[in-house]
């Protein structure tokens, strides 16, 4: 008889789990609060709402970037423009420029 009562209690619990559709966990209460939707709704062709700290950080880092670019360009311009001396065209010969000699006709 005790086996029969034990079996009946398992059947009762199993029936509850079968009817609920899923097994319950401790402290669950049977309600799922997460939902399946998007947490941040996208807004078509609208700028996102920025916080003051995001605006400050973006302006700070963009200012730092431009400072670094202009500083390096001013002090190490050879890195951008090249470090070779610009050739003086007055010192080129006619032969180097591909100009035939005057006495040749």
Curated annotation (Swiss-Prot):
Biased composition (Acidic residues): 93-105
One Pfam family matching this protein: NADH_B2
Record: transit peptide: 1-33
Region (Disordered): 85-105
Compartment(s): Mitochondrion inner membrane
GO biological process terms on file: mitochondrial respiratory chain complex I assembly
CC terms in the record's Gene Ontology section: mitochondrial inner membrane; respiratory chain complex I
InterPro entries in alphabetical order: NDUFB2_animal
Record carries keyword Membrane: yes
Membrane topology: Peripheral membrane protein
UniProtKB keywords: Electron transport, Membrane, Mitochondrion, Mitochondrion inner membrane, Respiratory chain, Transit peptide, Transport
Subunit structure: Complex I is composed of 45 different subunits.
Role according to the record: Accessory subunit of the mitochondrial membrane respiratory chain NADH dehydrogenase (Complex I), that is believed not to be involved in catalysis. Complex I functions in the transfer of electrons from NADH to the respiratory chain. The immediate electron acceptor for the enzyme is believed to be ubiquinone.
Family membership: Belongs to the complex I NDUFB2 subunit family.
Protein name per Swiss-Prot or TrEMBL: NADH dehydrogenase [ubiquinone] 1 beta subcomplex subunit 2, mitochondrial
Native species: Pan troglodytes
